[in-house]
Design a protein with these regions (language model features):
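Extreme N-terminal starter segment of soluble prokaryotic enzymes
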Residues: 2-3
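Short alpha-helical segment within the catalytic ATP-binding CA
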Residues: 79, 92, 120
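Conserved phosphate-binding and hydrolysis motifs of nucleotide-dependent enzymes
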Residues: 58, 62, 90, 129
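Conserved acetyl-CoA pyrophosphate-binding loop and the N-cap/start of the following alpha-helix
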Residues: 84, 88-97
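Acetyl-CoA-dependent GNAT
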Residues: 7-85, 100, 104, 153
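C-terminal "cap" of GNAT-fold acetyltransferases
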Residues: 107-111, 115-122, 127-131, 135-155
Length: 155
């Protein structure tokens, strides 16, 4: 079964924001962990039509946010439903995201940033073809965290 991408509705945004809770250190990714991120995610104007619900069958399984950096470079944020993480779904999901971005936006590069403690995600991104670009520190969730910026060169 394939993944389907559709513009995120307000109802779907609220489900993700208030019902998707991750275990342990991954709770960092809970939308409610940072008020500014939560407000932006729930605000239709801020979200625009570049945040997508990702469904498989009739189930919402993930989301994908896309921000245009230049005509050919797009920065993404993505999240999988907590009960589906760590179960081998990542490669297929990430490849579907890349295919969607390339087909809709004609991208040359895709960038993303991930906390350096998220070794599971970093391993996945590298496996699919993302390369490390730089590390940086950012204030979020009430503290300062180190992030790794990664780049995928579209073929």
């Amino acid at each position: 079964m394939t993944y389907k991408f559709s513009v995120l509705t307000q109802e779907q945004a609220e489900i993700i924001a208030f019902n998707w809770h991750y275990d342990g250190e991954y709770s960092f990714y809970d939308m409610e962990a940072d008020q500014e991120d939560l407000d932006e995610f729930l605000n239709l104007k801020d979200r625009g039509n570049s945040t997508f619900a990702v469904t498989k069958g009739n189930e919402m399984v993930a989301f994908l946010s896309i921000r245009k950096v230049t005509d050919r470079i797009f920065d993404i944020g993505l999240g999988m439903r907590p009960d589906l993480t760590g179960k081998g779904n990542g490669i297929e999901f990430l490849r579907a995201c890349i295919h969607f971005i390339q087909s809709v936006y004609k991208s040359g590069k895709i960038t993303l940033s991930v906390t350096t403690f998220n070794h599971r995600a970093i391993k996945l991104y590298r496996k699919v073809g993302f390369k490390d670009e730089e590390t940086f520190k950012q204030n979020t969730n009430g503290s300062t965290f180190e992030f790794l910026k990664m780049v995928y060169e579209c073929k």
